[in-house]
């Protein structure tokens, strides 16, 4: 018997004891082997282990293949385990958290194939110098990545591309000197970014993209305030409530914003968001700031006018089917220093037009030249019409010429006259040309017979010594109805068909212009062929201008009288309503209440009031019978209306209405709730 006991005791001593603590938390088995001096994975781990702690053990190296039997393992903690090598040659399909912080790892293997469900990776405070581009491949469910306290100097540009669901990124306390462009691209759910304690001097333009980033830590970097920092300075101004100062042991949500913590190292230690970069090129000077567009796209930029569209119409007055050339409606932004225009490939000539802010521009036979330059003639259009060689025309329709109004006349409707142009016959040896400025010379059409140059489409050029230049009208010119008398030509000449250039303005939208009547900037627009009929265009323009001038509603006197009339009618109506209300109140005060009241009926209800009995409270404890009954008598006056007049003669208020009865009824109601009245 004693021998058997000794054998059992010896067998127990030979069997190794399981030194880890096993507990169950929220239906998950948790095994705690922290600080047990383990150099290898302890045997006898429960197969349903979900949380395994192996921190503060001198493991040296670790392989996930040892955890193959633990199919339910969700968390693995290897903090401060003196790891120098981590192998992921065994697949853990349910592992969500891997903590290898405070070790001696110099590189990280590719984790996506062995740990497809990983959501949190903590590799802080190791000796990582660089990361391979495929380190995070396959970690599509990764939410938190902690790489703080390493020796990283650069990062692969596409390192975070596989982690589209990343929410927290900690790169603090490294040796990063630059960040790759597009590093945060595709991280739409990123809300916390730690970049403090690095060697960053600037960030690439467009680095933050359109991310919201509610919690950002950028302090502790030697930010160099020069022209390259303007992007970060503007981003800090636009997101001043999202920049925080990190404190040890304090959650990001528990801290307060501190945008002043991001400071320049070379500019008197001022906050970066206050740096304006006065000597740096601005977008208006051709510099590319590449700012993120946080505002609306239609926001007005300084010094930029709103886009406008114009159309140039060119048609022939010689043929019945008029050919029209419409300009491409390209929007143009006019800057203070220069102008930009989008030209068509078929464009042969452009003319600087003066745009007026009118919703429907009238059809003008010509454009008003600028006051500083002499009147010029237009160059020929891309599709000039040629005269018919078989039948020489007998008459030539001249071009219309608007006459400059007299200085004493107000800028009202002008009735211009027409100046017939009679081409003079020329000899074959000479070819006359129309005098034009040196900037826009006109080439006459060559012909074997004596020809005449094309008449200009602008107003006829007067002699410089007798006629001054035509000044620019202060108001948009309207299209008058020209009268065009025929002109008989010499039989020896063959006139060419003149061309007339009209300008049809489309609906223009001008943003940021204080007065709609002020002229806008000038820009150049191309010409593209189209079709239009000259007589119809003249009739539409003339009818529009005549109807707008002759309509009664557009009379300025009538427009001013209408509000005044409505104002007077409102005062009269208010006065009438006040008088009616005063009369009603006066009549109501003089009417006697007795006249309005109906007949009064009085009904007497008498209730017998029993004898009042006083019973001490002590007796009630021993009283086995029923409680005494109390009765009250009330006098009710029933009337046809709610009006209660004075008491009639011979009646006085009873004691019940003076307070005693009210106290009595209240006492009865409280003490004896079964009593009813």
From Swiss-Prot:
It is found in: Membrane. Residues 17-564 are extracellular. It comes from the Eukaryota. Its main location: membrane. The keyword Transmembrane applies. Glycans are attached at residues 309, 319, 323-324, 346, 354, 368, 372, 376-377, 399, 487, 497, 500, 523. LRR repeats lie at residues 72-93, 94-115, 117-138, 141-162, 165-186, 189-210. Two GP-Ib beta are disulfide-linked to one GP-Ib alpha. GP-IX is complexed with the GP-Ib heterodimer via a non covalent linkage. Interacts with FLNB. Interacts with FLNA (via filamin repeats 4, 9, 12, 17, 19, 21, and 23). This is Platelet glycoprotein Ib alpha chain. It comes from Canis lupus familiaris (Dog). The lineage of its organism: Eukaryota, Metazoa, Chordata, Craniata, Vertebrata.
């Amino acid at each position: 018997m004693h021998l058997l006991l000794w054998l059992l005791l010896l067998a127990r001593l030979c069997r190794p004891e399981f030194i880890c603590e096993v507990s169950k938390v929220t239906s998950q088995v948790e095994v705690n082997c922290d600080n047990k001096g383990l150099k290898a994975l302890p045997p006898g781990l429960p197969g349903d282990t979900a949380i395994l702690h192996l921190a503060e053990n001198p493991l040296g190296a670790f392989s996930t293949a040892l955890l193959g039997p633990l199919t339910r393992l969700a968390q693995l903690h290897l903090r401060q385990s003196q790891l120098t090598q981590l192998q992921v040659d065994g697949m853990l399909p349910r592992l969500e958290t891997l903590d290898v912080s405070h070790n001696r790892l110099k590189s990280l293997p590719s984790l996506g194939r062995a740990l497809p469900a990983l959501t949190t990776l903590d590799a802080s405070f190791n000796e990582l110098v660089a990361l391979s581009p495929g380190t995070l491949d396959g970690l599509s469910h990764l939410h938190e990545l902690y790489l703080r306290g390493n020796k990283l100097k650069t990062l692969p540009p596409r390192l975070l591309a596989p982690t589209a669901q990343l929410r927290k990124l900690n790169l603090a306390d490294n040796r990063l000197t630059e960040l790759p462009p597009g590093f945060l691209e595709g991280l739409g759910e990123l809300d916390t970014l730690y970049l403090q304690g690095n060697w960053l001097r600037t960030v690439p333009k467009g680095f933050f993209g359109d991310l919201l980033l509610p919690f950002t830590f950028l302090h502790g970097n030697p930010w160099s305030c020069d022209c390259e920092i303007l992007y970060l300075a503007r981003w800090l101004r636009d997101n001043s409530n999202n920049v925080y100062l990190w404190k040890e042991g304090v959650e990001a949500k528990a801290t307060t914003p501190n945008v002043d913590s991001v400071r320049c190292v070379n500019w008197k230690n001022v906050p970066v968001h206050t740096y304006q970069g006065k000597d740096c090129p601005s977008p208006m000077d051709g510099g590319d700031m590449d700012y993120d567009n946080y505002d609306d796209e239609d926001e007005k930029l300084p010094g930029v006018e709103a886009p406008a569209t114009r159309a140039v119409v060119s048609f022939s007055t010689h043929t019945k089917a008029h050919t029209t050339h419409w300009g491409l409606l390209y929007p143009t932004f006019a800057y203070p220093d220069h102008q930009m225009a989008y030209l068509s490939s078929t464009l042969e000539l452009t003319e600087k037009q003066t745009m007026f802010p009118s919703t429907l521009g009238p059809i003008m036979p010509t454009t008003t030249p600028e006051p500083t330059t002499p009147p010029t003639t237009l160059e020929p259009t891309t599709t000039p019409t040629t005269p018919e060689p078989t039948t020489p025309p007998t008459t030539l329709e001249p071009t219309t010429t608007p006459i400059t109004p007299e200085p004493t006349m107000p800028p009202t409707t002008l009735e211009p006259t027409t100046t017939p142009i009679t081409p003079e016959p020329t000899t074959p040896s000479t070819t006359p040309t129309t005098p034009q400025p040196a900037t826009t010379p006109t080439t006459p059409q060559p012909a074997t017979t004596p020809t005449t140059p094309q008449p200009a489409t602008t107003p006829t050029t007067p002699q410089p010594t007798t006629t001054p230049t035509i000044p620019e009208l202060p108001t948009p010119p309207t299209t008058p109805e020209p009268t065009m008398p025929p002109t008989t030509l010499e039989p020896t000449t063959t006139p060419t068909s003149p061309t007339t250039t009209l300008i049809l303005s489309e609906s223009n939208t001008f943003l940021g212009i204080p007065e709609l009547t002020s002229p806008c900037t000038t820009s150049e627009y191309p010409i593209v062929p189209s079709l239009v009929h000259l007589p119809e265009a003249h009739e539409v323009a003339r009818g529009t201008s005549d109807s707008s001038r002759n309509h009664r509603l557009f009379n300025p006197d009538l427009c001013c009288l209408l509000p005044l009339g409505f104002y007077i009618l409102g005062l009269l109506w208010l006065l009438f309503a006040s008088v009616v209300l005063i009369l009603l109140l006066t009549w109501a005060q003089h009417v006697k209440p007795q006249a309005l009241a109906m007949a009064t009926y009085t009904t007497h209800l008498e209730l017998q009031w029993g004898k009042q009995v006083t019973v001490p409270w002590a007796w009630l404890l021993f009283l086995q019978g029923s409680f005494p009954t109390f009765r009250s008598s009330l006098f009710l006056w029933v009337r046809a209306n709610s009006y209660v007049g004075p008491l009639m003669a011979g009646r006085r208020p009873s004691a019940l209405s003076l307070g005693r009865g009210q106290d009595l009824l209240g006492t009865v109601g409280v003490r004896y709730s079964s009593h009813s009245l």
